[in-house]
Each structure stands twice: as C-alpha cells, then as structure tokens.
Amino acid sequence: MTHPPAAPASAGPGAFVLGVDSGGSGLRVALGRVGLTGPLSTTVCAEPVRTGPGGIDAGHLLDQLLPAARELLERAAASDDAATGTATTGTATTGEIAALAIGAAGMATLGERLRAELPGALADALGVRRVALAADAVTAYAGAVGQRPGAVVAGGTGMIALGTDLKEWHRADGWGHLLGDSGGGAWIGRAGLDAAMRAHDGRRGGSAALLDRLRAVFGPAEELPGLLYPRSDRPAVLASFAPEVAACAGADPVAAGILRQAAGHIAEAAAAVCPPPAGTAGPGGEGSKGDGAAPSDESGEGGEVALTGGLFRMGEPLVAPVREELARLLPGARVTAATGDPLTGALRIARALAAGDLRLPRHPTMLFVPSEHGPGEHGGTAVRGEPRTG
C-alpha cells in the first residue's frame, strides 16, 4: 500500500476538495473548492457500503467512490469550459484534489479496514495526500456548527449527542436501540406502540388514539408481534411509528407525555456533552466536565446546541419540549438548527484540512488524519463516554 508523501501546509483556493457521507442509504459525494462555500456538484450511489466480519468493506467503498469522484471532476471540467468558452481534450486531473474527508456510519467501531487501506488507495487512485476519516457523528457535528465549540444532537432512528471544546470529544448515547438511543425515533415509536398495546389490553397507561393509529398503520394489534419480531430492521419499523405519536400529541396526553420524556432524554444527552462557556468552570473545576453533570453557567451564557437529523422534522410537538428541557438543564444555551448535514460537514472538514486549518480534535476512531501520523500510528485525544482505542 502506498503512503502519500507529505503535503504542503495548505492548498490554494482553487484546489478541489471531496466530501463523502457513507450511511445506511448509500454513498453521497460532493466536490467543492477550497476557497468556495458549498459544493460545486454532488452525486449519489444508492447501494450502502457492505459491512462484514472485518468491518466496513474498504474495497466496496472504493468501487463506488472512485467512479463518483471522476464523474464530479469531469463535470467540473465541463463547467469550467462552458464558463471560459474553451474546450479541453481532457478532464480535471485527479491530482488537483487537495483533500478528501469521509464520514461513515460505524467508523468508530467498524472502520479499522478503512483506516488501514483507504489512505494509500486514495493516494494511488486520486493523488490525494490529505485524507480525514471521521465517524458520521463528527461529520454531523461539522455540518451543524462547523468548527466552533458546542454540542450537536443527531436524531433519527437512533440518537447521539456529541460535543467538543476543541480539545477533546464528549459523547453521550448512540448505543443502539437495545442499550440506549433514548429519545430517538425507535424509542418514541416503541413507547407509542407500548401505549397502544396497553389500550388494547385495558392496562393503565394506554392510549386509544395511538391504538387507532397502530391499526391504521400495521393492522390488527394482536398481529403486530408476528409482523415485528421476524424483521431484521426492527429499529426502523419502530421509528416509523414516531410520526404517529407526534401527530396525536396535540390532543392525546399519553402521546404528549411520550414526547416530553423523549425531550428529557435528548436534553440530558446534550447537557452531558456541552462544553461550559468560555471563562466558566464545570462541576469538576477548571472548565472540566466533572462527573458528567451539566456544566455550571455562572456567566449566564450557555453554549450552542444544534439539533440535526430527521427526528426533528416532527416539528414543534418534539422540538418545543426539547427547548424547554434544554433551558432547564443548560440555562442560557443557544438552541439552533443545523446549518448543514453530514455531507456538508465532510466537505467542511476537507476544506479545513486542505487549508491547514482543521481545528476539530483528532481521535484514532472519531477523526483520524493519517498524514499527521506515520503508517500504523493512531494518535489523538480520548472521547469521554467511549473507551480509548488505537
């Protein structure tokens, strides 16, 4: 495997950068320039990257990424020709890619092959010498708030909170629907179905409104176990009922209570990872996170908490109680909508890497930059909430 030679400290504003978002719905790739905001063009590969006993399949990712990258470079060359009124016999060369950042679901736990194989393969195929390999939570963070200190709650089928003071990462939840993801889509959907089944049985805590929605979506309540338990995508099936809970919340106190509980879990995760404001100390003193409690806020100014992901498209039935719970746990916190998605975040990381201005904390599994280490070296800071690896 080729290891890329040392790259110059920074690339010029016209150099290309690539951002990649690999998730359950496939691979998304964006081409941009160092000196421009936003992508020049994007493309989608609908097939998810395979995961096997050895982790995420690096070869399968490359089989999709390399043609996509060349397609985007060809588009850029054609666009440049149209803008200048000239014609070229070739395309933009792969050597013009100054940096590439990949954010992948499962990178932290299943990304060893990617970290071992991709840097050399990308150097050989695309001539790129600056590569960042990130967990999808990190690209979600970069997409939501950029390189500022703060916290991001990424909610979808699951739920994870990630925060940083630009020195280390802090993680809360994201442990899957059996061990956590409290307040996420699957959690809300399961709680809603539980309330529906309670109404079906005549037990306390039931909701007739949610039982009606269960029947409309899945059919007879007594047949639901046979539909749900054989499925390999049970979290997604549970999460599909979460919008029904939100739709009932305005008139049904049980549904509203489920969303308020979810909001409490979401706010607790955000409070666990949100760095204290500059000049203040958390409960451990000296600005530390102490034992995980919410940081003190003696200045009256809280940190930034961004909400991102499809979960929050349920709107005010969920977002309003989340704001209320955050105001209680993090007084003065600024709750914001994400300014971009994980693909935006991957492109932002690539731009910062190309410009020599990547300020987000390095970590061997969360944000690994191989050009900053020798072959086989995994350096970086620890993630609170996750054992250090590498």
Description of each model-found segment:
Residues 1-77, 93-95, 144-149, 193-390:
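ATP-binding/phosphotransfer module of carbohydrate and carboxylate kinases, centering on a glycine-rich
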Residues 23, 30, 105, 138, ...:
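Anionic group-transfer/hydrolysis microenvironments
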Residues 108-206, 361, 372-379, 384-390:
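Phosphate-binding/catalytic loop of phosphoryl-transfer enzymes
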Residues 51-53, 107, 174-182, 332-337:
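A short glycine/serine-rich beta->alpha loop
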Residues 70-125, 130-132, 142-145, 231:
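Short beta-strand-loop/turn "lid" adjacent to the catalytic site in phosphate-handling enzymes
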Residues 104, 135-137, 309, 339:
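A general secondary-structure junction signal
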Residues 101-107, 155-157, 302-314:
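Glycine-rich beta-strand-to-loop/alpha-helix junction loops that act as flexible
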